[in-house]
């Protein structure tokens, strides 16, 4: 079975590289990444359909909501990432997982496994 593909939206280059490495280390494949909303929408609109997306909540003052909406409409599970907990999370995303930065490998591994688990 091919590794699950993860898309990452993160505006800080060093954190993006770290997260890409961590995702690979956990046995997943990087489907793609973006550092801003427009870049993410462009890539995802080109036919890319990852198995899951990790979305940083606040991209230099801009919410990642449009990317989340696009992914949800496409049936792609998402996990939000934030250095500030759920602050800035739109009410409509209240039930979604929010991982706290800095990344904890065990928590990330658990969140990815749960989000990618087939429905029972």
Predicted features along the sequence, with ranges:
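Non-catalytic signal-transmission and effector/linker regions of two-component phosphorelay proteins
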Residues: 1-5, 104-120
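Conserved acidic carboxylate
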Residues: 10
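Two-component/phosphorelay signaling modules centered on CheY-like receiver
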Residues: 13-32
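Acidic, metal-coordinating helix/loop segments flanking the phosphotransfer/catalytic sites
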Residues: 33-52
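Acidic catalytic/metal-coordinating carboxylates
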Residues: 36, 61-66
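Active-site residues of response regulator receiver
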Residues: 56
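Hydrophobic/aromatic residues positioned on beta-strands within the core alpha/beta folds
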Residues: 79-81
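A Lys-centered signature of the CheY-like receiver
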Residues: 101
